[in-house]
A protein has these predicted regions:
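Glycine-rich phosphate/diphosphate-binding loop of Rossmann-like nucleotide-binding domains
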Residues: 1-81, 93-102
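Rossmann-fold NAD(P)-binding glycine/threonine-rich loop
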Residues: 77, 81-139
Length: 139
């Protein structure tokens, strides 16, 4: 994963995964749990979502709502690592994520951009696994 690539130790880091889909949200919560990170699985209608995001060490955004998480969801005194998995269009039809990048980049310890963040990593991972899978299917 991207977090592993940058040698981010997940053990003991509080994580909030926003989005409960079977494609991203739930698998990501399992992955983080398997690396000893306590995880809160939330969604866009979680009551007082800011209470969770403002105290988290890691925030994974996968809710499918353009620029949903703005600066008010984060605490500059406790900067999180923010992974934006969202792929949306804003009001001008420009690609954007679930996180309002321009507002949050000055608050977050690290943040993935959209486009250019998680998307290329996904393509790389698919390509990395495609050849071995094809080789196995030919045997």
């Amino acid at each position: 994963t991207m977090l592993k690539h940058y040698k981010i130790d997940l053990a003991g880091k509080s994580a909030v995964v926003i989005g409960r889909s079977m494609i991203v949200g739930r698998p990501m919560s399992y992955l983080l749990t398997n690396h000893d990170a306590p995880v809160t699985l939330a969604h866009s209608r979680t009551p007082d979502l800011r209470r969770f995001t403002r105290t988290a060490d890691i925030v994974i955004a996968a809710i499918g709502k353009a620029k949903f998480l703005d600066a008010t969801y984060f605490d500059a005194a406790r900067p999180p690592i923010v992974v934006d998995v969202g792929m949306n269009h804003d009001e001008n039809w420009a690609l954007c994520g679930d996180v309002h990048f321009d507002q949050v980049q000055g608050i977050a310890k690290a943040i993935t951009p959209v486009p250019g963040g998680v998307g290329p990593m996904t393509i790389y991972s698919l390509a990395e696994h495609l050849l071995p899978a094809a080789e196995r299917s030919l045997c």
